């Protein structure tokens, strides 16, 4: 199904997410109700779009979708999923991950501010 106000990038992301679980893109808040096997695959797709690409449009689309997810659930699973798909030695990927965390899970930044490092 084509959405009239969607960009080609959004259509691509929607298709990728909905391939895991039909209708998930438009109901992303329900991700917390899915079995972990499904919800973590969807979160991985979103993190990859938000951190691996070079084009700002899909990066921002994925960030926007991630911010729609319950923050408590997100805080529990972002570290686990990020370790599966982000190369922490790659400066680009790591910077995009930090930007994502600053927008979607700022609690991690706050925790770092209170560390002794």
Which residues does each PLM region occupy?
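DNA-contacting interfaces and partner/effector-binding or oligomerization modules
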Residues: 1, 11-20
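Structural detector for internal amphipathic alpha-helices that build alpha-solenoid repeat scaffolds
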Residues: 1-4, 22-37, 59-72, 91-104
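Amphipathic alpha-helical scaffolding segments comprising HEAT/armadillo-like alpha-solenoid repeats
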Residues: 6-14, 37-49, 71-84, 106-116
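Short active-site-adjacent helix-start/loop capping segments
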Residues: 40, 54-58
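Structural signature of alpha-solenoid helical repeat scaffolds
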Residues: 50-54, 85-89
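Short acidic, glycine/Ser/Thr-rich loop/turn "cap" segments at secondary-structure junctions
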Residues: 80-85, 92-96
């Amino acid at each position: 199904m084509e959405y009239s106000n969607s960009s080609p990038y959004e259509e691509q992301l929607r298709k990728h997410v909905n391939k895991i679980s039909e209708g998930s893109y438009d109901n992303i808040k329900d991700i917390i109700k899915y079995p972990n096997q499904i919800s973590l695959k969807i979160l991985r797709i979103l993190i990859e779009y938000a951190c691996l690409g070079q084009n700002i449009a899909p990066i921002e689309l994925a960030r926007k979708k991630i911010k729609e997810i319950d923050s408590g659930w997100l805080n529990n699973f972002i570290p686990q999923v990020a370790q599966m798909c982000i190369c922490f030695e790659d400066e680009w990927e790591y910077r995009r991950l930090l930007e994502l965390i600053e927008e979607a899970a700022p609690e991690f930044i706050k925790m770092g501010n209170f560390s002794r490092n």
